[in-house]
Amino acid sequence: MDFCLLNEKSQIFVHAEPYAVSDYVNQYVGTHSIRLPKGGRPAGRLHHRIFGCLDLCRISYGGSVRVISPGLETCYHLQIILKGHCLWRGYGQEHYFSPGELLLLNPDDQADLTYSEDCEKFIVKLPSVVLDRACSDNNWHKPREGIRFAARHNLQQLDGFINLLGLVCDEAEHTKSMPRVQEHYAGIIASKLLEMLGSNVSREIFSKGNPSFERVVQFIEENLKRNISLERLAELALMSPRSLYTLFEKHAGTTPKNYIRNRKLECIRARLSDPNANVRSVTEMALDYGFFHTGRFAENYRSTFGELPSDTLRRRKMKWLDPEESLPPLP
């Protein structure tokens, strides 16, 4: 991929020791450690620019380097592969990212990455508060456990996004932007990610001022573990089933059936993520909420949250493990 994302004005290192690059990245971009192959003299390059609350970084270690991070805590990492490839391992899965692909790390995601010798990335560090604000500004609902994205994406999902990043880099390098302008750009990036990438964010649950909708939503919340019929909801709303569909499309942005399914999935995810919840098995949890086809349940869960329910449960158990002890060795 040949895009101008940060030029020599933002250059920090060229032909540098990888550990020097790593130390700088630890200070500004994200906590991690690196492991170098035996032999050879990798020469790293780094471009970095702070733009309001965003950190923009173009990085190459110049060698096959393994990067391990315990998590970003309060930030998201958007990593775009520009050259070479990068092996990602996480929650029992692995994938070779290549140019045109995008890796998105959530704040509590442990990262185990192995760069190819020619790997070059562009990284955007985005504070979680920016995504929270974008949810609020767009009247979307942020789950109690926080916003989570799937790890793997293709830039084709984000039409025009690479051009937006190029504009942000140009703005950061060539002008002294006002804080309000910087905040505006950060909000656009956050809204674009939430709108076009798979995440657990849904529309605002309630639409205040509509008693019929609020009455139906309250009934759903009180009966999530039961079989809820559309006829019963239409009766509660005092309208026909067709009008009920219109009501949900207007106030929830989806159908009644999808709304109920998503709320069940969100409750299951909250239970699986809660260290104080008594969860004996994912299957039992699915059956408890009326998902009798476990394979279809797992697929719906993954398409909604970007991971399998077993991955959510495993992450809760792994949360306090040392990342270098819990991750597989470098091949």
From Swiss-Prot:
DNA-binding region: 231-252, 282-305
A biological-process GO annotation: catabolic process
Cytoplasm listed as a keyword: yes
MF-aspect GO terms: DNA-binding transcription factor activity; sequence-specific DNA binding
UniProt keyword Protease, yes or no: no
Annotated ranges, domain HTH araC/xylS-type: 214-315
Protein known as: XylDLEGF operon transcriptional activator 1
Its biological purpose: Regulatory protein of the TOL plasmid xyl operons. XylS activates the xylXYZLTEGFJQKIH operon required for the degradation of toluene, m-xylene and p-xylene.
Subcellular location: Cytoplasm
Matching SUPFAM superfamilies: Homeodomain-like, Regulatory protein AraC
Keywords: Activator, Aromatic hydrocarbons catabolism, Cytoplasm, DNA-binding, Plasmid, Transcription, Transcription regulation
Superkingdom, taxonomy of origin: Bacteria
Transmembrane segments: none
One Pfam family matching this protein: AraC_binding_2
GO cellular component terms attached to this protein's record: cytoplasm
Matches recorded under PANTHER family: ARAC SUBFAMILY, HTH-TYPE TRANSCRIPTIONAL ACTIVATOR RHAS-RELATED
